[in-house]
Every structure is written in structure tokens, then in C-alpha cells.
UniProtKB/Swiss-Prot annotation:
Subunit structure: Homopentamer. Interacts with membrane protein M in the budding compartment of the host cell, which is located between endoplasmic reticulum and the Golgi complex. Interacts with Nucleoprotein.
GO cellular component, one term: host cell Golgi membrane
Virion surface side: 1-16
Family statement: Belongs to the betacoronaviruses E protein family.
Intravirion side: 38-78
Protein name: Envelope small membrane protein
Transmembrane region(s): 17-37
Keyword annotations of the record: Apoptosis, Host Golgi apparatus, Host membrane, Membrane, Transmembrane, Transmembrane helix
Lineage of source species: Viruses, Riboviria, Orthornavirae, Pisuviricota, Pisoniviricetes
Length: 82
């Protein structure tokens, strides 16, 4: 085999190896980013379920009780009592 053919084959093998490593690193970085995004979505969902929904329920219950209290006044005494 001629020497320049061996150099071309060697260069091809090295380039293929470098390309494979770059693809693997890119794949790992993309997976890490997607995993981090998924973790953030799960944290936000948990926060929504554990913090905001009970707070909204308590707020709505308190508001309903306040409105009910405001609408149900005891009757005024007759005017001849004054």
C-alpha cells in the first residue's frame, strides 16, 4: 500500500473518531438540558399542587364566609326600642 493511502485511511479513522466523540458529547449535553427542564417542570407542578391550590382554597373559603357573614345580619330592633 502506498504511504499517502495509509495517511488518508488514518485521517479518515481519526476524523470518524472525533466526529463520534463530538456527537456523543452533544447528545449528553442535550439530555442533561432536557432532564434539567423536566426537573424544573416537576418542581413547578409540585409547588402548584402543594402551595398554590391550598392557598386558593383557603382564600375562596374565607371569602365565601365573609360574604355570607356580610349578607346575614341579625334583624334590627324595632324602632320603638330606641
Amino acid at each position: 500500500m502506498l504511504p499517502f493511502v495509509q495517511e488518508q485511511i488514518g485521517a479518515f479513522i481519526v476524523n470518524f473518531f472525533i466526529l463520534s466523540v463530538v456527537c456523543a458529547v452533544t447528545l449528553v449535553v442535550c439530555l442533561a438540558i432536557l432532564t434539567a427542564i423536566r426537573l424544573c417542570v416537576q418542581c413547578v407542578s409540585g409547588c402548584h399542587t402543594l402551595v398554590f391550590l391550598p392557598a386558593v382554597h383557603i382564600y375562596n373559603t374565607g371569602r365565601a364566609a365573609y360574604v355570607k357573614f356580610q349578607e346575614s345580619h341579625p334583624p334590627y330592633p324595632p324602632e320603638d326600642w330606641v
